[in-house]
Amino acid sequence: MRTIHLPVALLTLGLLVPLSPAWAHGEKPDQVKILQEQSPSNAPGKKAVMLTVSYGPGQASAAHQHPGAVMAYVLEGAVTSKLNDETEKTYKAGEFWYEAPGTVHSVSRNASKTAPAKLLVWSLVDEGRPVTEPLSQ
């Protein structure tokens, strides 16, 4: 039987909580699954995180920003995104975008009301920082 160590469990919880905003009216949040975390030897003090974000039909993420660099790749469906003051753009499966640290991500949603969408996300963030931070209301 595998033992889960408390620091690992707390770190994982600390990463997931900022990625899962509160939702009202019975809506379900996007589903975030951390695939791997590594501390690259050539980037002391940094942590590389790979995860997936799955959206059901019509689902969206709350407005947020990332303290580290982010690269997002659409694995399935289509995702509409708005970064900083740019116009909204819809990315289809096979397309990708980059977010510089601190970029305001005000729109991130499944572009379809009938089909799911899924992103593969890679982020390089300072050790001890979450991948995603909610925007202050």
Where are the regions a protein language model picked out?
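A short, N-terminal "cap"/entry segment at the start of jelly-roll beta-barrel domains
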Residues: 2-9, 13-49, 82, 98, ...
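Short acidic-glycine-tyrosine-enriched beta hairpin
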Residues: 40-44, 55-56, 85-102
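A short beta-loop-beta micro-motif enriched in histidine and acidic residues
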Residues: 46, 58-73
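Structural recognition of the beta-strand scaffold that forms the well-ordered cores
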Residues: 63, 71-73, 96-99, 121-123
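Short beta-strand His + acidic residue motifs that chelate non-heme Fe in jelly-roll/DSBH
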Residues: 63, 81-82, 99, 105-112
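Glycine- and acidic-residue-biased ligand/ion/polar-headgroup-sensing regions
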Residues: 68-85, 95
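N-terminal leader/targeting pre-sequences
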Residues: 87-88, 102-108, 131-137
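Ligand-binding loop in jelly-roll beta-barrel domains
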Residues: 103-129
